[in-house]
Structures are given as C-alpha cells and as structure tokens.
Amino acid sequence: MGDQLILATGGYDHTIKVWQAHTGNCIKTMRFVETSQVNALDRTPDKTRLAACGYQCIRLYDLESNCTAPVINFDGVQKNVTRLGFQEDGNWMFTAGEDHHVRIWDMISAPPHCSRVFDCESPVNAACLHPNQVEIGMGSQNGNVFLWDVKSEKHECIVPEVDASIQDVAISPDGHYLAAANNKGNCYIWSLCSSPDQKMSTMRPTKKIQAHTRYILRCKFSPDSRLLLTTSGDGTACLWKTSDFSKWRELCIENYWVWDAAFSADSKWLFTASSDGVARLWKLETKTPTREYTGHTKAITALSFKDEIIRKVNH
C-alpha cells in the first residue's frame, strides 16, 4: 500500500478509513478510541504508517498489513492532542495539545519517546513544520502565534488579534509565509525572513484577510506555494492567491462545516472533509467535486493525502 495513491480520513464515528483516491473505494477501516474524534492524521514519510491523534491519545497504524489495531500507543499523553506531523526523514514527530505543550518525539528509538517540549502557556490548537525542518509554527487558544527553533530552542511570539483563538497555522512550502487563522474568521500572514547571520526566521506582518464570516478550522498552502486555503464553519473552503492574497476560488458545501483539506502534489486538486460525513475531491479550475468518499457515519474531522511518490515517478 505504500506506493498507492491513498486518502485517509477520520472523524466523530471513531474510525479511520483508508481509500483508493482514484476510485473512491474504501480498502481498510481502523478503529480509533471510543472516547474521541480524530483531530489530525499524517502519513509517515515512507508512507507505510499513519499517525492519528485525539483526546489523550496518539496512535500509529501499519498501512502495509491487514491489522486494524494500532501498532504503537504513545504513553503519557494528557488532554486533547490537536495536531501532529513528521520531519521529512521520519526521524521525529511533533504533536500539539491542550496541555499547553508542543512535543518532539524521537521515532528512531523503540518505543518512541518525547525528547523535547515547548510550553505555550495555553492550550495549543495547531502546529506545523517549516520546510527547513528546524522551525515549528504554533497557535494557541489565548491568541499567541509562536515560531520555535527546535535546535537552538529560541522562539518568537506574536499576538495578531486580542481575544481571538488561533485555530490553525501553516507555513508555505517555499518558506516565504506563515499564516494563522482564528475563530473570528480572520487569517493573518507574515513574511518569514532569514539571513546567514540570523539564528532563526523573523516574522514580518504582511496581510490580514477577513476570510470567513464564521470560525476558521484550517489554513493550508498549496505545494507550489501559489495558493492559501482556508476552511470554515460557514460551509466554504476559500482559496487565496499568495501573489496578492486576493480570493481566487470559493468551494461550497452548504450547511456543513469544512473541517480539513489537502492538496494534490500538482496543486490542481483538493480533498475536503466535512461534517456531513463525506470527503470530496475537487478540481480547482472548475470548482466542482469530481468524486465523493462515503462511508463515515458522522462528521469527518481530519484527512491526509500525499502523492509525492507519483509526482517523482512522473518527472
């Protein structure tokens, strides 16, 4: 399954489903914990395993076998774990949670263990890794946006808006921008500047977008860094051109929350997850869904899709 084009989804029905992206067929269903929805999913860089997080749990599943139970349960996790992701070589994983901490997990050791911790002094809703593989962007419920250098332990902190909770953060693949979206429908963008004599990137305020009328749930940059995506509780996923941050497209799933999304490697297609329990594949040029992935019985709150292997083969 490692080289297949697969989509993984998870949500409020306590299951994680693995789909053939090109057919819409569900090829595997894995049980999550009965006490939590799935908050985030990420596939390991070698594409053999899938990590999932939720309330007081982080689990790692094997995609190569028929086993539907997790192969690793991470110990000692408190409160809600909101985000996770992998360093590009798979040597470590980061997680963010409502225990106020962003943690670095050593994935080479057996079993994996927490090797480093950053205290945000407030529940952490979001975290993302800079393409330089050294800095992590973070957003907290008290409105702070952090940039943390994992190696030097230095960090920068900005509060873009008072009395607003940061719901998601994203860093563009070219490393030029950091975006943070909040519960008031606003998305803030900073230019990331660095020079040889600097220890870490600095954040320069660049743009504020009044992106949605309601809660923003996710923000993500396209792989080519030309688009910024925001998804919301207002039933839309909006795409903004990073050249001037003007709106380019609006995808509508009326009356439902759009919880998560993922781009294809060529930045021409988008997967969305929504509260109607359906994942959709959209062709961005036409603004229309071309495929639906149905099988979840409740809202889908997280998805993961990576097709870099196919892209490399084609090139």
From Swiss-Prot:
It comes from the Eukaryota. GO terms for cellular component: cytoplasm; TORC1 complex; TORC2 complex. WD repeats lie at residues 1-31, 33-71, 76-115, 119-158, 161-200, 211-250, 253-292, 295-315. GO terms for biological process: regulation of actin cytoskeleton organization; TOR signaling. It is found in: Cytoplasm. InterPro entries: G-protein_beta_WD-40_rep (IPR020472), MLST8 (IPR037588), WD40/YVTN_repeat-like_dom_sf (IPR015943), WD40_repeat_CS (IPR019775), WD40_repeat_dom_sf (IPR036322), WD40_rpt (IPR001680). CDD domains: WD40. The keyword Repeat applies. Keywords: Cytoplasm, Repeat, WD repeat. Belongs to the WD repeat LST8 family. This is Protein LST8 homolog. It comes from Drosophila pseudoobscura pseudoobscura (Fruit fly).
